[in-house]
C-alpha cells in the first residue's frame, strides 16, 4: 500500500457560537474559504488532480444539509470533476474524513484528496432535530445520549475530583492564550471574514472563544450543569460552543515527491474503537491502543499528543489510563484544547490534527498522536510521523 502524507493543514479561527464573529457567516462559506485557502498556499497542486473531498459534519441539516462538502466545493469554484462527500462519525467526523481519504490513497483509488470538516453550532445547534429511537432504551441508558452525564459517570468511576477538573480547564485557557500571544497558532489559522459586535465586517485572525481571565478560583464558583444535585461537571470544564472549519491536503508520498511539495507528516497508524455508551468519553483509550499497535509504536514513543477536551472529567481518565498524567506539561495539549477553543463537532478531528502537526514541527518531534472521544461510545485515533 502507498504511504499517505500530509502536505498542508489549515483551520479557521474558532468563533463564539453565541453572538460571535461568524453569526452571519454560513458553514459552507467557512468550508469554501478553507478549500480555496489551502490550495492557494500550495500552487504546485493542480486542483483538477484532486480525486475527492471528504468533509466531516455532524448536524447535516439546514445550511449543513444536502452534502455540505459538495456545496462548499462548488461555492469555492473548484473543478466540477472533483467529487465530494460529507462524513459523519459524530465528534470524530473530520478525523474519519482523514482516514477515508487516506485509505483511498493507500489502495490506489486516489493520488490527492482534500479532507476537513465544519460545524456551525450557532446556526445548527447540537440538539437540533434530535430524535433517538425509543427502543434504544432497551440496550442503552437514556443518559448515555447526554454527553455531560457520561462525563459525570466517567469522572466518578476514575475518582476525578472537581478541583482536578477546574485545574485542567484553567490550564487549557492559559495555554491557548499563551499560544495566541506568542503566535503559535499563526501558521495554522487562515484569517476569515466575520462581523464585529457593531455589525461591521472585519477579518478575524485569532480564536475568540478563549477566556484568558479564567482561574481555578473562578471556575470553582460555577454550579454543576448536568447533575445539579450531585455532579462536578460545569460549563467551565466542558468544551466551549464554537463555530469553525478545518482542512488538510493529503496525497501519496510518491505524488508529493513528484510535485516537489514539502511533506509535513506521514500517517503511521489509524484506528477506531467502540466502548460503553455510558462512558463514551473513554473511547480514546482503546482507539489509541489499536492505532499504536498498528503503527508498531508505544505511547512512550509519542512526542506530542492532542487529546480532544470534550470535558475535563473525560480527558483526565483517558490521560490516566494511557499513562500520560506525569507528562502532561511536556506532551499533552500544549496549546490548550477544546475547553478553551471550543469543539465544533465536525471540525475538531482535523483541527486537533492540524494543531498537532504544527506542534510537532515546532518541537522537532518525530511522532505525534491525535485522538478523541465520540458520542454514544466510540473513539478515534491517528498516529503521525514527521519525515
From Swiss-Prot:
It comes from the Bacteria. SUPFAM superfamilies: Thiolase-like (SSF53901). It holds the Pfam family Thiolase_N. It catalyses: an acyl-CoA + acetyl-CoA = a 3-oxoacyl-CoA + CoA. This is 3-ketoacyl-CoA thiolase. The active site is at 91 (acyl-thioester intermediate), 343 (proton acceptor), 373 (proton acceptor). Belongs to the thiolase-like superfamily. Thiolase family. GO terms for molecular function: acetyl-CoA C-acyltransferase activity. It is found in: Cytoplasm. It comes from Vibrio vulnificus (strain YJ016). It is an enzyme of class 2 (transferase). Catalyzes the final step of fatty acid oxidation in which acetyl-CoA is released and the CoA ester of a fatty acid two carbons shorter is formed. Pathway: Lipid metabolism; fatty acid beta-oxidation. Its EC number is 2.3.1.16.
Amino acid at each position: 500500500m502507498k504511504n499517505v502524507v500530509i502536505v498542508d493543514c489549515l483551520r479557521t479561527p474558532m468563533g463564539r457560537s453565541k453572538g460571535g464573529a461568524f453569526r452571519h457567516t454560513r458553514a459552507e462559506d467557512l468550508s469554501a474559504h478553507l478549500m480555496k485557502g489551502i490550495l492557494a498556499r500550495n500552487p504546485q497542486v493542480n486542483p483538477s488532480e484532486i480525486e475527492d473531498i471528504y468533509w466531516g459534519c455532524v448536524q447535516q441539516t439546514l445550511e449543513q444539509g444536502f452534502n455540505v462538502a459538495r456545496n462548499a466545493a462548488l461555492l469555492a469554484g473548484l473543478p466540477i470533476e472533483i467529487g465530494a462527500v460529507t462524513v459523519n462519525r459524530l465528534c470524530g467526523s473530520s478525523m474519519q474524513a482523514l482516514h477515508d481519504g487516506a485509505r483511498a490513497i493507500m489502495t490506489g483509488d486516489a493520488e490527492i484528496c482534500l479532507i476537513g470538516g465544519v460545524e456551525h453550532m450557532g446556526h445548527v445547534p447540537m440538539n437540533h432535530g434530535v430524535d433517538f429511537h425509543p427502543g434504544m432504551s432497551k440496550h442503552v441508558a437514556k443518559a448515555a445520549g447526554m454527553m455531560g452525564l457520561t462525563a459525570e459517570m466517567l469522572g466518578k468511576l476514575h475518582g476525578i475530583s472537581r478541583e482536578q477538573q477546574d485545574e485542567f480547564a484553567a490550564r487549557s485557557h492559559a495555554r491557548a492564550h499563551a499560544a495566541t500571544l506568542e503566535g503559535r497558532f499563526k501558521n495554522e489559522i487562515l484569517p476569515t471574514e466575520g462581523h464585529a459586535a457593531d455589525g461591521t465586517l472585519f477579518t478575524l485572525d485569532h480564536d475568540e472563544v478563549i477566556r484568558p481571565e479564567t482561574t481555578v478560583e473562578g471556575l470553582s464558583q460555577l454550579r454543576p450543569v448536568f447533575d445539579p444535585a450531585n455532579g462536578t461537571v460545569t460549563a467551565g470544564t466542558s468544551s466551549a460552543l464554537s463555530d469553525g472549519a478545518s482542512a488538510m491536503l493529503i496525497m501519496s508520498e510518491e505524488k508529493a515527491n513528484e510535485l516537489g511539495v514539502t511533506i509535513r507528516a506521514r500517517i503511521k497508524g489509524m484506528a477506531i474503537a467502540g466502548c460503553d455508551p455510558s462512558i463514551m468519553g473513554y473511547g480514546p483509550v482503546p482507539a489509541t491502543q489499536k492505532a499504536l499497535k498498528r503503527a508498531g509504536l508505544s505511547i512512550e514513543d509519542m512526542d506530542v499528543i492532542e487529546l480532544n477536551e470534550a470535558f475535563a472529567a473525560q480527558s483526565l481518565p483517558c490521560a490516566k489510563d494511557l499513562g500520560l498524567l506525569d507528562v502532561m506539561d511536556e506532551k499533552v495539549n500544549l496549546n490548550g484544547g477544546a475547553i478553551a477553543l471550543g469543539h465544533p463537532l465536525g471540525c475538531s478531528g482535523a483541527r486537533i490534527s492540524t494543531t498537532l502537526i504544527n506542534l510537532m514541527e515546532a518541537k522537532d518531534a518525530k511522532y505525534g498522536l491525535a485522538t478523541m472521544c465520540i458520542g454514544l461510545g466510540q473513539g478515534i485515533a491517528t498516529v503521525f510521523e514527521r519525515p
